[in-house]
Amino acid sequence: RRQRQMCIRDSYDTNGDGIGDLPGIIEKLDYLKELGVDIVWLSPCYRSPLADQGYDISDYYDIDPRFGTMEDMDRLIAEAKKRDMYIVMDLVVNHCSDEHEWFKKACKDPDGKYGRFFYLRDKEDGKLPTNWRSYFGGSVWEDLPGTNKQYLHVFHKKQPDLNWENPELREEVYKNINWWLDKGLGGFRIDAIINIKKALPMHDYEPDREDGLCSINKMLEEASGIGEFLGEMRDRTFKPHDAFSVGEVFNAKDEELSLIHISEPTRHLRI
């Protein structure tokens, strides 16, 4: 099948606000079909403050009003099915936005349920919990507002990492995936999936620059066990729906990659 990625803001604009929208993609489905496209992959269109092109999600159950409404999304899925086409969305579950309700609740009660949805560490005499450098540069640690703690973010500081070691967090992720698949979504392209497994317990590495920090890649090289998370996610979500899945993978060890792309029953995702 032939796939086409669609950055919605750069797609057809139906209301003249200068931003592409979901109704615009609906209008162009026939054209895409003529091109031989079977799968339309949408870049993030969830509600988001857009600190990182929509990869900072503040509500996994809503469409950002810049791009349309949930009714528009339902119509897009339905119209695509009429043409024997599938809609695939980006799934961003290594992190969320710092404007997500989970994170807001974590700030209010860092020792409570939602504090455990993230990687929080106490501040100790001005020393960082680890010397890891984020993909965006600088430390992966940022002060948790109103507390004496810091939170982990391997990407932008407005993208706190979700704690996949917490079963309650994983349940919320699976619940959301199934909610979308029940709507008729064809599947997901899962963003930065290799990052959901951290090397624990967290510790420092030899600095590789004068800033005293070390590339986050060093931690990923040491992390192991992502196959357990991916297998659970597959069995709880994609497999029952016979849904499409593809993962963005980088800096993975060969043995970890083998768990992701080899044939059933051990294949967790396609890459």
Language model regions located:
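Single conserved hydrophobic/aromatic residue that forms the stacking wall/gate
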Residues: 1-10, 260-271
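Catalytic cores of alpha/beta
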Residues: 256
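Acidic/aromatic-lined carbohydrate-recognition and catalytic surfaces
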Residues: 2-5, 9-178, 182, 195-253
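Hydrophobic residues within beta-strands of alpha/beta enzymes
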Residues: 40, 188-190
